[in-house]
Amino acid sequence: LREFFLMVFFPAFLYNGCMDKKKLLLIDGSSVAFRAFFALYQQLDRFKNAAGLHTNAIYGFQLMLSHLLERVEPSHILVAFDAGKTTFRTEMYADYKGGRAKTPDEFREQFPFIRELLDHMGIRHYELAQYEADDIIGTLDKLAEQDGFDITIVSGDKDLIQLTDEHTVVEISKKGVAEFEAFTPDYLMEKMGITPTQFIDLKALMGDKSDNIPGVTKIGEKTGIKLLLEHGSLEGI
């Protein structure tokens, strides 16, 4: 599998033809597009073309992308998308992401044009049935590290913070379309007092309301961190 990705996928991700530094930019397209949509939601009626198509997500996504390309200067880039609601996780747990509000039609109608935008920019995008963008990003991150890349991951999903290490920076989108919080192992330790591995354990203890995953009763972030600092790991607890 590793050789397949290195020979077939990574050459296809080549963005600017510069291989002086092997820098891979991995973008959670579904998450970033959703953030872009809501960043400009208050101006929804302003972002509409002559055909009646809303364009706020398209515009916001392009703006985010332009800022990232200028700042990160990647040699390779891939935008990963979710392939649908049915994944191996829903087969394991039927209520996974249950109870979420319906995706706004104004956002849904723009999605094909975001992919078209990427095509026109010469940026590869990818999705895989039964898997989420997170899974693609996590897999490629580890494979790229083995091949000597430095990686920047961009998402609105904090779950991906677990991937940060000496070669991977995880940037979480914040307000607007150009503000990100960059997580490294040192910054995670400074902000939360835990390691990336402990971050995984913390998520297991807390659960995730946004994904409808229950956690341990009465354990929130503060209590979870306290337990991990006392016992080291989930297994230690």
Regions found by a protein language model. Name each.
Residues M19-R124, K175:
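Domain-level signal for Mg2+-assisted phosphodiester chemistry and nucleotide/NA-binding surfaces
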Residues L1, F5-L6, F10-L14:
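Short hydrophobic targeting helices and cationic amphipathic motifs
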Residues Y15, K21, D45-K48, G98-I237:
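Extended two-metal-dependent nuclease catalytic cores across DNA- and RNA-processing enzymes
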